[in-house]
């Protein structure tokens, strides 16, 4: 039976001093419904309901504190925040447990010890073990939960473990987000127990590493998980918290298409003007996931969580592999800072997403994107979806049948071979571009082909987000994929050559092995499978780069790009190969003159890039030149396109001077 609204104060008072079992006798036998009624209760009355004299003294002390408006001195409440006596009493819903609507910082729910039954062991941590459990609500309804119990030794819980456990409770009880694991309540028994939402499908890491015959996760679903994770981490940041342990092992699958951030044992509040948390002493931390400043100084911030987000992205697309496997923890910092090494691009990861990961791994925290920006950047890097239009049975090609959904990982209009995943078989491989057509798959959120592969197109992940673009679907994409013009790989070689010749820069140190150096602009190896992202109206397309060897490409940082569907060129829906987009007759001498003028004005660009730049600007030579210079500077730096444009304007559009300015500050 649930308490009446008028007597909630009594239940709170009794629970505060661990006398909740006397709630019904005091209410029904002694008819106490208001605090002043205790003035007429004698000690023998309390004796008659079984309350001993020590308990009576505790009750009297609690009554004094309640009447004086002083909060309870119970140790749990002192740490977690107690029930405010002046709080307005609100009766619980008939289908809810004995929960009270608490002020911010108050307990969500105190659960009777007998209401929770523990089952099989799900896992264990530094200071607790997690069991599957069953929570019986006062209404009689039972719901499956996860129960985390404080690990107790022969002499009781250690002070550090108890503090960490209660700190985790205090964090979780303030959080409410669809992609953050929810705390239902706390059991004040022996041992202390947290009753949490159950994620029945286990951790994402366990799912990624599940052996056959468990099928792999679709790469499009991994992209969805990344967006959910970015939203949850943006929420934690808005709460002034740093997670410090972001990894696939701490992402739980609440359903086949939903993850939730869990394990808040290392979460700490961000403080000070610099908005960071600095460890006070040696404590265990996940070295392979940590940012350099965390390993060097013990400093954690939202920017260090962004670094961990990049490592988590790498985990997802590498099948749950351990980052920096085989590298001793004490050498990881040296690899990151001295060698400037970064984790290599996983085979299933598009260049756009890897470029985004590299941006998350910027050496300086201020250069990393925020989680709120990452949500938009991921939208820009979204993988395109298509459908098979003819059977593919060629040796070595990805097998597909008409109607199969195909997620395009890499591909561009100037190549006849693309890379993707068959949504029916979940196999990944190369296939003829003519076998797939981009088509609206019924409103799925496949707005921008995330495989805007070339580092260039990973760069679509830079800058702010545009609401209209985020809502775009495949209907916004040109049917013939002709929005992306031919972009030969020679273009990236041109960019590298341009920067070297103009700036006289020597080769930068490599990361060694297969790890790409941070922030190095790509000297691309020959690639076979460029990508096909839509191009913004004011920006020339970037060169596709695909790494077909163990040496990872070193893509540019990802940046979001703004574009609208009316700027896309049109073509036949079933077009299999890219054609030169319309926009000016290539045989027109005036048009040829403009192309040559643009090519001579921007060192390192290709003839095809100049054509695209002119078409996107309606033949305006000056605008085309400026857009190409912005594009060049964009790939050299970790700045947004808007910043690059401002820097170029400050240097009177002198690309050489602007490049030196940026490199001096990188």
From Swiss-Prot:
Q: Where in the cell is it found?
A: Membrane; Cytoplasm
Domain Protein kinase span(s) in chain numbering: 116-383
Q: Catalytic residues per the record?
A: 245 (proton acceptor)
Q: Which class of enzymes does this protein belong to?
A: transferase
Q: Which InterPro entries match?
A: ACK/TNK-like_SAM, Kinase-like_dom_sf, Non-receptor_tyrosine_kinases, Prot_kinase_dom, Protein_kinase_ATP_BS, Ser-Thr/Tyr_kinase_cat_dom, SH3-like_dom_sf, SH3_domain
Q: Write out the entry's keywords from A to Z.
A: ATP-binding, Cytoplasm, Kinase, Membrane, Nucleotide-binding, Phosphoprotein, SH3 domain, Transferase, Tyrosine-protein kinase
Q: Which domain of life is it from?
A: Eukaryota
Q: Which residues carry this modification: Phosphothreonine?
A: 510
Q: Which residues does the annotated region (Disordered) include? A: 442-589
Where, by residue number, does ATP bind? 122-130, 148
For this protein, what reaction is catalysed? L-tyrosyl-[protein] + ATP = O-phospho-L-tyrosyl-[protein] + ADP + H(+)
Q: Per the record, what phenotype accompanies loss of this gene's function?
A: Mice develop spontaneous tumors, including lymphomas and carcinomas at high rates.
Q: Where is the composition biased (Basic and acidic residues)?
A: 457-473
Q: What Enzyme Commission number(s) does the record list for this chain? A: 2.7.10.2
Which tissues show it?
A: Expressed in whole embryo and all adult tissues examined including liver, kidney, heart, brain, skeletal muscle and intestine. Also detected in various myeloid- and lymphoid-derived cell lines.
Give the protein name, as stated in the record.
Answer: Non-receptor tyrosine-protein kinase TNK1
Task: Write down the species.
Answer: Mus musculus
Taxonomy-wise, where does this protein's organism fall, top ranks first? Eukaryota, Metazoa, Chordata, Craniata, Vertebrata
Q: Which gene encodes it?
A: Tnk1
């Amino acid at each position: 039976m649930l308490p009446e609204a008028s007597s909630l104060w009594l239940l709170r008072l009794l629970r505060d001093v661990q006398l909740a079992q006397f709630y019904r006798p005091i209410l029904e036998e002694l008819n106490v419904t208001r605090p002043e009624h205790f003035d007429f209760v004698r000690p023998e009355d309390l004796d008659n309901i079984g309350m001993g004299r020590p308990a009576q003294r505790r009750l009297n002390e609690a009554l004094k504190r309640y009447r004086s408006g002083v909060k309870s001195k119970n140790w749990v409440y002192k740490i977690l925040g107690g029930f405010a006596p002046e709080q307005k009493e609100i009766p619980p819903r008939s289908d809810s447990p004995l929960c009270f609507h608490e002020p911010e910082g108050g307990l969500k729910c105190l659960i009777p010890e007998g209401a929770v039954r523990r089952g099989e062991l799900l896992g264990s941590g530094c200071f607790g073990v997690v069991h599957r459990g069953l929570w019986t609500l006062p209404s009689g309804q039972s719901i499956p939960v996860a129960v985390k119990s404080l690990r107790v030794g022969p002499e009781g819980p250690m002070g550090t473990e108890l503090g960490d456990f209660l700190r985790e409770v205090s964090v979780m009880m303030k959080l409410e987000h669809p992609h953050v694991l929810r705390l239902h309540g706390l059991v004040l028994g022996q041992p202390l127990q947290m009753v949490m939402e159950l994620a029945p499908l286990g951790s994402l890491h366990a799912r990624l590493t599940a052996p056959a015959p468990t099928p792999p996760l679709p790469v499009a679903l991994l992209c969805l998980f990344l967006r959910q994770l970015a939203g949850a981490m943006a929420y934690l940041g808005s709460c002034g918290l740093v997670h410090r342990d972001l990894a696939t092992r701490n992402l739980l699958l609440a359903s086949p298409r939903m993850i939730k951030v869990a394990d808040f044992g290392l979460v700490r509040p961000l403080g000070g003007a610099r908005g960071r948390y600095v460890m006070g002493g040696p404590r265990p931390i996940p070295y392979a996931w940590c940012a350099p400043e965390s390993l060097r100084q013990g400093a954690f911030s939202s920017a260090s969580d962004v670094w961990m987000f990049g490592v988590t992205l790498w985990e997802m697309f590498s099948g749950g592999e351990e980052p920096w496997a085989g590298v001793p923890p004490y050498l990881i910092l040296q690899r990151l800072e001295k060698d400037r090494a970064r984790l290599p691009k996983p085979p299933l990861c598009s260049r756009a997403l890897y470029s985004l990961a590299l941006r998350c791994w910027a050496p300086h925290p201020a250069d990393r994107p925020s989680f709120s920006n990452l949500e938009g950047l991921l939208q820009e890097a979204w993988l395109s979806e298509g459908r098979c239009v003819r059977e593919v049975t060629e040796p070595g090609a990805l097998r597909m049948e008409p109607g199969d959904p195909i997620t395009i990982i890499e591909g561009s209009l100037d190549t006849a071979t693309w890379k993707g995943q068959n949504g029916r078989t979940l196999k990944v491989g190369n296939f003829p571009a003519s076998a797939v057509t981009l088509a609206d798959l019924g409103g799925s959120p496949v707005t921008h082909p995330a495989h805007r592969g070339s580092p260039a197109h990973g760069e679509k992940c830079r800058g702010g987000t545009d609401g209209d673009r985020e809502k775009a679907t495949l209907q916004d994409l040109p049917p013939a994929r002709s929005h992306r013009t031919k972009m030969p790989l020679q273009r990236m070689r041109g960019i590298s050559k341009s920067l070297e010749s103009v700036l006289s820069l020597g080769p930068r140190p490599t990361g060694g092995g297969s790890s790409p150096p941070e922030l190095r602009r790509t000297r691309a190896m020959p690639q076979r499978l460029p990508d096909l992202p839509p191009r913004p109206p004011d920006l020339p397309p970037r060169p596709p780069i695909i790494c077909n060897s163990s040496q990872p490409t070193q893509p540019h940082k990802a940046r979001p790009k703004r574009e609208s569907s009316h700027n896309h060129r049109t073509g036949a829906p079933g077009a299999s190969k890219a054609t030169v987009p319309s926009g000016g007759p290539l045989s027109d001498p005036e048009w040829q003159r403009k192309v040559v003028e643009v090519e001579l004005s921007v060192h390192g660009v290709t003839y095809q890039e100049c054509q695209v730049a002119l078409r996107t600007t309606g033949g305006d030579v000056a605008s085309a030149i400026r857009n190409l210079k912005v594009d060049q500077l964009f790939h050299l730096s970790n700045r947004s396109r808007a910043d690059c444009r401002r820097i170029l304007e400050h240097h009177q559009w002198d690309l050489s001077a602007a490049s030196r300015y940026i490199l001096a500050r990188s």
